[in-house]
Amino acid sequence: MKNAMLALSRFMSILGGLVLSFLILLTCVSIAGRLLNGLFHSDFMTGIAPGFSRWMIDIGVGPVTGDFELVEAGCAFAIFAFIPLCQMTAGHASVDVFVSFLSERTNSFLRMVTEVIFAVVLVVIAVQLASGMFDKIENRETSFLIAYPVWWAYALSLFGAIAAAIVGVYMAVVRVYEFFSRSIIIPEGTEAGH
């Protein structure tokens, strides 16, 4: 089970990384297009190369239409895509100043409670995201600029949220078992399986 959860976590992280890479490329293209569009509209370019400037504007050199909408949807997915690996490797930011002096047993209890709370929160988020997605489907809401159905972004995020919830519940079960059996199944702070 641990290997399956780790494989799911890694797959989601790779997918999230690919989506973020696409969004970076999209943003760069959009910024370059916006800059070039401004240049071709400038008095300088229209003065020295009016035909070329008009041609570049006419072929559509400019920002990517709906880039903000796509970045918004993609970032939401990417966040959910990275959560499973953070859960598996205890990679979330934490401050241990207040717990470093506590016993290992107390820290194990705190890890268990934290994982259970995190699992509950991830399940609630996934359920609420599904509810919101069904509302968007029913209302046929579309994005403003490129008019794609908003539920597509919700569905993409829901895919990531479900994966995060599955791994979150798994980690909660693992930490509960570890606490009561006084054993370590998945070491904290290192990638499982290494």
Report each predicted region and the residues it spans.
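Alpha-helical transmembrane segments and membrane-interface helix-loop junctions
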Residues: 1-194
